[in-house]
Amino acid sequence: MVGGTRSARVVGRSALSPRVTELTLAIEGDEPFRWLAGQHVTLRPDLPSGAPAAFSIAAAPSQTGLRRLALALSNGSALLAHTEVGSLVGLEGPFGAFTWQPAPSALLVGAGTGLAPLRAIVHDALGSDEATPVVLVAGNRSERDLLWHAELATLASEHLRFRYEPVVSQPDATWRGRRGYVQEHLEEITAGLAPGFRAYLCGSHGMVNACRELLGKLGVTEERIGYEAAA
């Protein structure tokens, strides 16, 4: 069902980082909720004044089945004030074409909660029969702020065709990984990708535009770049 309105119940809330909360929603009713990794939904609190807001689904259908969704919300989101465990929200969607496309290899670049749809795409790609190499570049302020950091590092250790490259802009003295902003590392990272790779970008407008500009200078055409940007 695309664009239909469903009800979903909040069945889980957990801290992904000091700034982000993960919500788990259980779809009400008998009909399965079908989506593609990378798509998003619009949520509306079950209140007369509840303003709708769009959120990317942070899980692939193969992870949660067709009855549950996982979303990542910044702690400043007004929606969090009305989504205690047990509460109902209206749900519309799924929407969007920010989904997996066949290519010799894939570059995924996300910052902040922009990592949510990319996490879904990673799980979907690794769970398929394809052998496409996938590189995920994930940016945030500090190691504590990196979303699903341990999970993604574990996936990289378990799948030879998946590489995880976390980048921290405000590292402490113990950080041994990449420093700065994601776009500052793309030239080096893309040098190891197969020609004709496809890029997926998700984050702030500034990050997405900087990555698009750099990839263009590296010869990546707009047709090979999928992106979603938020303010």
Question: Predicted segments — roles?
Answer:
Residues V2-S7, T132, V137-A231:
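Reductase modules of NAD(P)H-dependent flavoproteins
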Residues G76-L79, L91-W100:
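A short, well-structured juxtamembrane/interface segment
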Residues L115-G127:
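Histidine-anchored nucleotide/phosphate-binding helix
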